[in-house]
Each structure stands twice: as C-alpha cells, then as structure tokens.
Amino acid sequence: MNNIPVTAFGAKALEAALLKLKDVSRPRIIEDIRIARAHGDLKENAEYHAAKEEQSFVEGRIKEIELKLSRMQIIDVTKLSQDGRCVFGTTITLMNSVDNSEITYQIVGEDEADISLDKISCHSPIASALMGNEEGDKVIVKAPKGDIVYKILSVEYYI
C-alpha cells in the first residue's frame, strides 16, 4: 500500500475525528439502540433501524480513518529544504497572467483539501502543474474552460 501524504495539521484533524467517533458517536448510538430495543418489536421499529444504520456508517468511517492513519506519511513543510520550489505542504501565491489577480493556495492531502480555505489537493490540476516549479516560473494549468497561465510569486514553508 502507498503512503498517504498529509500535513501535521491534517493528521491531527483525522485523529480528532477518530476520537470523536469512538468516544462520542459510538457510545451515543449504542445507547440509542438500547432505548429503541426497549420499545419492543424490532421489525417495525424505525428508531432501531435508523440507529443500526447510523452505527454501520460510523463503524465504517472508523475503519476508514484508522486505515488512513496507518498509511499516512506526515510531511512537516518547515523541515523541508526551503529552496523556493513548490512541494507538498507549501503555500504558494500566484498571479493570473490574464487579469493580474493574485491567489494563494496551500498544497495538501486529499482529506485536507478545502477550496474555501485555499487548500488544494496535491492531485488537483493546479497542484500538479505547480509541483517542482519555483518562484518566478510560469505554469500552465489545464482547466475545464481552457488553459490558465500563472506566475509563481512566492513559495512559503510554514504550517
């Protein structure tokens, strides 16, 4: 199995999600099932079936997160060679060559990606175009509406 790259922040978020599922959701669902069973006939007990369905989902999510945690490779961007190259974990400021607008993204793992927080997946078209390039380079991003040319203004190595 391949390692899954993740930032230290992303690893902590996954660990927190797992802890919440195990320590909050799982016990609550067990209690919901116990209460629903007390209502009698389980064949037509909607509360029981809903709780069992939620239990199945939560247990599946726990297994999924545990697998990811066992396979993840935490990358501390502050310990990387700070040579101005775009790599996993770096925060990159770009300038659109058409309208000179600036945008800043951090390249993160799949589970951490959130465009509303300017965090893009390392597998996204933008990140793929940026990886390995350095400050001052121009990159072409293959987008659904056509190619976009960006100039890399800065590459920062912080968490």
From Swiss-Prot:
Instruction: Kindly list the biological process annotations in GO that this record carries.
Output: DNA-templated transcription elongation; regulation of DNA-templated transcription elongation
Q: What Gene3D superfamilies does its record include?
A: Transcription elongation factor, GreA/GreB, C-terminal domain, Transcription elongation factor, GreA/GreB, N-terminal domain
Name the domain of life this protein comes from.
Bacteria
Kindly indicate whether the keyword DNA-binding belongs to this entry. Answer: yes
Sorted UniProt keywords: Coiled coil, DNA-binding, Transcription, Transcription regulation
Q: Which cysteines are joined by disulfide bonds?
A: none
Stretches assigned to coiled coil: 46-73
Molecular function as annotated in GO: DNA binding; RNA polymerase binding
Query: What does the record give as the function of this protein?
Result: Necessary for efficient RNA polymerase transcription elongation past template-encoded arresting sites. The arresting sites in DNA have the property of trapping a certain fraction of elongating RNA polymerases that pass through, resulting in locked ternary complexes. Cleavage of the nascent transcript by cleavage factors such as GreA or GreB allows the resumption of elongation from the new 3'terminus. GreA releases sequences of 2 to 3 nucleotides.
Q: Which PANTHER family match?
A: TRANSCRIPTION ELONGATION FACTOR GREA (PTHR30437:SF4)
Please report the name of this protein according to its UniProt entry.
Transcription elongation factor GreA
**The organism of origin for this protein:** Vesicomyosocius okutanii subsp. Calyptogena okutanii (strain HA)
